[in-house]
């Protein structure tokens, strides 16, 4: 009997037959997708994220405002001077209450705005340079035309004389001593023209601008000076940022400057300089006599006799910076030793005889960085936060520099803010020129009629009541004065602080009585209730404090005092 084969099961792995229906069925099977449950965000977390975003955008907007103000400042200084200073001051006052919110706040980059501002500034600088070139070309053309007209006039005058002689038939040499003579007038004009040309030649420090431009590639600074001192418990290099450029000027340029400052000194001694341009003090003190000439914006000045005078013109009157020294500043800017936006607006010429020395100088707050000193003679200068000296003015400090003739010292950073510098005595005569920039808001008179007058100048003739000023870059530069031990005391220069805008404080009754940290957010209410801190004692939590001790018997009856009274029997 034949046994029929049973049909193979679909699960039999030994089956050799191919069943496409099975494959199709296997492919058609779908796997369900599991959807994760929706994340629920709390309302408080959403508000915190939104406030964080607002703060970041707020900080970015503040950075954009800073970039725009810097752009306007650079643009206006290159064109027409300070016109937006009042606007900048108003913006700064308006943003004072932003500081607690924006302190250490991170924000997205504003590099795109900064790059566009740089492009605009570069284009404006190029246009301004092209405009100056065109103006110089027009001036040169006018000078050429004027010279040709003068020559034509001279030829016409000579022709008229010859014609008159030919008509009369007599040729005679006539000496005309009349002051209205054409020949005399033309000769005097020629002399004046030659004098003007000579004066113009003396107004430029160099003979060839091409040579000066090529010299910029050869100028290499000497830097990396070290003078370690203790500042608030930390070892700090107090001369960081000091750069020295040796033999910056040539011998003929130094000779021209020496002759020029000698003429200025003679004019100052004879009283021919305006106002307080020439200053002579300590005349009877041997070795410490000082002669100096200040030009441009004043840094020293006398105290006026009438302090209560309402005369608005009662200001320090000095000579402007002469063209020759302006040419020196132009070369420093061209050689990129001083940035254009920090161009000096004042300078002081110091004269030292044999054995004379200066008092240590520390940058006052109303002077900007950098400060540059050009020495026209071989000199020795000492640097340091603390300087020691003997009775003959031999100063010793952490750093002593022997400077060659024509060297330039550029002081930035710690070397300008922390370190004092002094000119040491020497056996030869010395001349130095210090270039500086005074902040515009310190020498513009914005004071009220009844407020004390402040010109932003350093007063050397009468002490004033010292007022606390903020430390520069977070350090305290006050030093105990111990002259008997040989440690140098600070220079006896009374410094007028920069004008401070008045701050309006609310009444004590309006301010909240609760405790606080002093940082108030804009959306916080002043009179909001506050829970007591748990770690305070129960008496303080219930606001029951101990009564104050009674006042001393020496105080008047019915009166109170905020300070304890000590009675000595």
From Swiss-Prot:
Statement: the UniProt record of this protein carries the keyword Oxidoreductase: yes
Knockout consequences: Reduced vegetative growth and late flowering.
Substitution effect: residue 366 to A: Loss of catalytic activity
Keyword vocabulary terms for this entry: Coiled coil, Dioxygenase, Iron, Metal-binding, Oxidoreductase
Positions contributing to 2-oxoglutarate binding: 430
Extent of Low complexity compositional bias: 551-560
Cofactor binding description: Binds 1 Fe(2+) ion per subunit.
Binding positions (Fe cation): 366, 368, 421
SUPFAM superfamilies with a match to the protein in the record: Clavaminate synthase-like
Enzyme class of the recorded protein, top EC level: oxidoreductase
Biased composition (Basic residues): 531-545
Compositionally biased intervals (Acidic residues): 167-179
Reactions the enzyme catalyzes: an N(6)-methyladenosine in mRNA + 2-oxoglutarate + O2 = an adenosine in mRNA + formaldehyde + succinate + CO2
Name of this protein: RNA demethylase ALKBH10B
Name of the gene: ALKBH10B
């Amino acid at each position: 009997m034949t046994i029929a084969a049973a049909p193979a099961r679909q699960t039999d792995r030994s089956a050799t037959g191919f069943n496409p229906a099975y494959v199709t069925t296997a492919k058609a099977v779908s796997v369900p997708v599991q959807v994760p449950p929706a994340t629920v965000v709390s309302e408080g977390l959403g508000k915190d994220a939104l406030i964080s975003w607002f703060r970041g955008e707020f900080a970015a907007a503040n950075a954009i405002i800073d970039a725009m103000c810097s752009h306007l400042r650079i643009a206006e200084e290159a064109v027409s001077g300070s016109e937006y200073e009042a606007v900048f001051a108003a913006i700064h006052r308006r943003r004072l209450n932003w500081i607690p919110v924006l302190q250490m706040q991170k924000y997205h980059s504003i590099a795109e705005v900064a790059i566009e501002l740089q492009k605009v500034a570069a284009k404006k600088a190029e246009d301004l340079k092209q405009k100056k070139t065109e103006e110089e070309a027009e001036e040169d053309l006018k000078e050429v035309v004027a010279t040709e007209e003068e020559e034509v006039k001279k030829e016409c005058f000579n022709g008229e004389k010859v014609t008159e002689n030919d008509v009369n038939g007599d040729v005679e040499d006539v000496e005309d001593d009349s002051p209205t003579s054409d020949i005399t007038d033309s000769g005097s004009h020629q002399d004046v023209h030659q004098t003007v040309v000579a004066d113009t030649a003396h107004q430029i420090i160099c003979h060839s601008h091409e040579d000066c431009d090529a010299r910029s590639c050869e100028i290499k600074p000497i830097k990396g000076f070290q003078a370690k001192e203790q500042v608030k418990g930390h070892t700090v290099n107090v001369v960081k940022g000091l750069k020295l450029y040796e033999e910056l000027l040539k011998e003929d340029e130094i000779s021209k400057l020496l002759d020029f400052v000698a003429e200025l000194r003679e004019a100052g001694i004879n009283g021919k300089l305006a106002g307080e341009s020439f200053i002579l003090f300590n005349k009877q003190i041997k070795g410490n006599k000082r002669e100096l000439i200040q030009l441009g914006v004043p840094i020293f000045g006398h105290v006026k006799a009438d302090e209560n005078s309402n005369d608005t013109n009662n200001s320090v009157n000095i000579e402007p910076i002469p063209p020759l020294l302006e040419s020196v500043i132009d070369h420093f800017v061209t050689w990129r030793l001083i940035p254009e936006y920090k161009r000096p607006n004042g300078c002081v010429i110091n004269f030292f005889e044999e054995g004379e020395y200066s008092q240590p100088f520390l940058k006052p707050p109303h002077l900007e960085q950098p400060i540059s000193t050009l020495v026209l003679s071989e000199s020795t200068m000492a640097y340091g936060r603390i300087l020691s000296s003997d009775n003959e003015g031999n100063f010793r400090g952490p750093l002593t520099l022997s400077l060659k003739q024509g060297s330039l010292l550029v002081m930035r950073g710690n070397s300008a803010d922390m370190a004092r510098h002094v000119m040491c005595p020497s056996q030869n005569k010395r001349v130095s020129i210090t270039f500086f920039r005074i902040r515009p808001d310190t020498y513009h008179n914005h004071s009220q009629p009844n407020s004390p007058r402040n010109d932003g100048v350093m007063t050397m003739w009468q002490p004033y009541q010292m007022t606390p000023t903020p430390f520069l870059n977070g350090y305290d530069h006050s030093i105990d004065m111990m002259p008997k031990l040989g440690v140098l005391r600070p220079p006896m220069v009374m410094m007028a602080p920069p004008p401070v805008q008045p701050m309006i404080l609310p009444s004590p009754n309006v301010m909240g009585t609760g405790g606080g940290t002093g940082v108030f957010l804009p959306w916080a209410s002043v009179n909001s209730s506050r829970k007591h801190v748990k770690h305070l004692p129960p008496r303080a939590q219930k606001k029951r404090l101990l009564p104050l001790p009674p006042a001393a018997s020496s105080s008047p009856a019915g009166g109170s005092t905020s300070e304890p009274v000590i009675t000595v029997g």
